[in-house]
């Protein structure tokens, strides 16, 4: 698939870029999984979670670059958007593969993705422990 992509787009795929893309895509998937897990934990606590899910989807599409490219936003807002986990999930892997992200920023973005993974995992761990202490179980 990557060879076909390279042929169609004309972008030469160097091994470092492919490895960076694979790492970034896996980290993006992990961030997405952790958000899904967190939303699942929230559904245990709250009866009506649909509004939170809709809000999450809206943020993901807006700040992930699905609705509008990040470059369409004002420069000050762009600087904030690139720090969000939504950008780390969607835009970073595609920017690496399409060579839109300069090589000197790839490592920074991979580190930012790792930061989001660690932060979400830590928050989930703490929230889950607190949630399970107050949960009531019924049945056998």
Descriptions of predicted regions:
Residues 1-53, 107-115, 119-122:
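Alpha-helical transmembrane segments and their short interhelical loops
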Residues 39, 44-96:
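Transmembrane helix segments
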Residues 97, 114-140:
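Junction motif at the cytosolic side of a transmembrane helix
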Residues 6-8, 67, 97, 126:
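Helix-loop junctions at the membrane-solvent interface of multi-pass transporters
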Residues 29-41, 62-67, 71, 122-131:
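Transmembrane alpha-helical segments that form the membrane-embedded catalytic/substrate-channel core
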Residues 94-106:
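Membrane-interface alpha-helices
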């Amino acid at each position: 698939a990557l060879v076909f992509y390279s042929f169609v787009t004309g972008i030469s795929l160097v091994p470092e870029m492919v490895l960076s893309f694979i790492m970034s895509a896996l980290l993006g998937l992990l961030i997405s999984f952790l958000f899904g897990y967190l939303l699942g934990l929230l559904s245990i606590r709250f009866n009506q979670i649909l509004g939170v899910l809709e809000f999450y989807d809206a943020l993901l599409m807006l700040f992930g670059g699905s609705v509008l490219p990040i470059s369409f936003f004002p420069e000050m807002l762009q600087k904030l958007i690139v720090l969000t986990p939504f950008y780390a999930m969607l835009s970073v892997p595609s920017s690496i593969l399409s060579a839109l992200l300069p090589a000197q920023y790839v490592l920074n973005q991979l580190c930012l993705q790792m930061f989001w993974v660690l932060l979400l995992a830590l928050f989930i761990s703490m929230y889950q422990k607190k949630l399970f202490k107050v949960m009531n179980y019924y049945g056998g």
